[in-house]
Every structure is written in structure tokens, then in C-alpha cells.
From Swiss-Prot:
The lineage of its organism: Bacteria, Bacillati, Actinomycetota, Actinomycetes, Kitasatosporales. HAMAP family: GreA_GreB (MF_00105). Belongs to the GreA/GreB family. GO terms for biological process: DNA-templated transcription elongation; regulation of DNA-templated transcription elongation. This is Transcription elongation factor GreA.
Length: 165
């Protein structure tokens, strides 16, 4: 999944289905469970000193935030196939870069939004400084981006392949 222009998020059908399942769980069984926790904690008495109540309310807030995020994401999603394997850096691709052209100092990452993040590969969003710097470049190109401290940085695109995870 990747954010593209105009806040449209590109998703594979599999990713879309996974996020939709999560939303259905959060708006169904998870809401029922947290409501039951809050009700049980409320019955314990004084709410000002009721740690279980406050923990359940905090959990409820996190769940509702995730519901809003997923709803917005799925409403703006464009479901389609993975990007073409044409060597052009695009959302949904695994990119390998060399910092300052030094092929011994490389980084491989998935160019996608955080919902696509997994533990097996580092993920950078297309809106991040590095992501926006490499977006649209081809294998072999040198790309520039701005570091958080304002200094320019240069990378060479070594590989750009569709993500298959």
C-alpha cells in the first residue's frame, strides 16, 4: 500500500481485504469487548481512582482512533495490481539505494505507507524525505533529498522491484 497524489492510497486486493477485516473486527467484536470492560470497571465504584476503568477508556480511545484511520484509508484506497517491474521507483516497490554512490553503504526498503510496514523490511512512506527524493527515479539514477537537519543528501538507485510480501 502506498500513498499517491491527492491522498489516494494504492493497495493490493490482499492488503485491502486485510485492512477491511481489521476494521470489521474493531467495529464489531472489539467494541463489544471494550464496552464490557468499561462496564465491569464502572461497577467497581469510584471512577476517580479506578485504574481498570481508565485503562479500558484509554484502550477504547486507541481503538476508535484506529477505526477512523482505517475508515479514511479504505475510503481513499485505489485497489489494483502491484506496480510494474520496469525499474522506476513507485509506491509498492522494494528499493535498494547506495548513499552518496557508495555501493558498500546501501539500504533496502519498501516504499509504502505505514499500514504496509512489516518486521521483515524497513518501510519509508512516499511523503518522507527519502521516499519523495527517490520517487519516479530509475535504476542507475542519482537522486537528492533533504535530511531532517536541512542538509542535502545523495543516493543512487541500485534496484527497484515490486513488493511480493
Amino acid at each position: 500500500m502506498t500513498q499517491t497524489s491527492e491522498n489516494v492510497t494504492w493497495l493490493t486486493q490482499e492488503a485491502y481485504n486485510k485492512l477491511k477485516e481489521e476494521l470489521e473486527y474493531l467495529t464489531g467484536p472489539a467494541r463489544t469487548e471494550i464496552s464490557a470492560k468499561i462496564a465491569a470497571a464502572r461497577e467497581e465504584g469510584d471512577l476517580r481512582e479506578n485504574g481498570g476503568y481508565h485503562a479500558a477508556k484509554e484502550e477504547q480511545g486507541k481503538q476508535e482512533l484506529r477505526v477512523r484511520q482505517l475508515t479514511q484509508l479504505l475510503e481513499s484506497a485505489k485497489v489494483g495490481e502491484a506496480p510494474a517491474a520496469d525499474g522506476v521507483v513507485a509506491p509498492g516497490m522494494v528499493v535498494t539505494i547506495a548513499f552518496d554512490g557508495d555501493e558498500d553503504d546501501t539500504l533496502t526498503f519498501l516504499l509504502a505507507s505505514r499500514e504496509y510496514a512489516s518486521s521483515d523490511i524497513e518501510t519509508y512512506s512516499p511523503q518522507s524525505p527519502l521516499g519523495s527524493g527517490v520517487l519516479g527515479h530509475k535504476v542507475g539514477d542519482d537522486a537528492q533529498y533533504e535530511l531532517p537537519n536541512g542538509k542535502p543528501a545523495s543516493v543512487r538507485i541500485l534496484k527497484a522491484e515490486p513488493y511480493n510480501g
